[in-house]
């Protein structure tokens, strides 16, 4: 099971360019990772320009021959392909109405990441979003073990 999320960057005209992020979308991991490794407008833009992804910062790769995960250099695992490009939303409301079963959304605003929990309610046929509940949540400070 994955904690899905959406990562966006606020553009000068208040539109948001965003991508899907599949794994570990909760603030304690994705929020901390975004703040640690993608903490400038340039880094956030480059991350989003790559399109939809499995993970923004992966240090493991599955080896099909051995059936085990191997440690690798940290990298973003993009899906690739024409259907995986970023989506441009004209405003925050439109951004919250993108349906990718996300539990959290993140927006890079000026010089920092802002995180929100999100819940979308659908009509009885699950064809249309009828209500969106968005609440800003704190991105915790990175925990270190000593």
What name fits each language-model region?
Residues 1-26, 30:
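Short, extreme N-terminal segment that most often corresponds to the first beta-strand
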Residues 31-35:
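All-alpha amphipathic helical-bundle segments outside canonical DNA-binding/catalytic cores
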Residues 36-146:
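Low-complexity intrinsically disordered segments
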């Amino acid at each position: 099971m994955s904690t899905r999320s959406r990562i966006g960057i606020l553009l000068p005209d208040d539109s948001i360019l965003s991508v899907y992020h599949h794994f570990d979308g909760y603030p304690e991991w994705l929020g901390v990772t975004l703040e640690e490794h993608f903490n400038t407008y340039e880094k956030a833009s480059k991350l989003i320009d790559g399109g939809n992804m499995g993970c923004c910062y992966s240090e493991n790769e599955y080896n099909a021959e051995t059936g085990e995960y191997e440690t690798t250099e940290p990298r973003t695992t993009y899906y690739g392909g024409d259907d995986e490009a970023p989506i441009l939303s004209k405003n925050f409301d439109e951004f919250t109405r993108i349906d990718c079963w996300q539990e959290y959304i993140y927006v890079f605003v000026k010089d920092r990441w802002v995180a929100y929990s999100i819940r979308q309610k659908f009509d009885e046929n699950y064809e249309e979003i009828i209500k969106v509940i968005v609440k800003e949540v704190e991105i915790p400070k990175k925990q270190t073990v000593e």
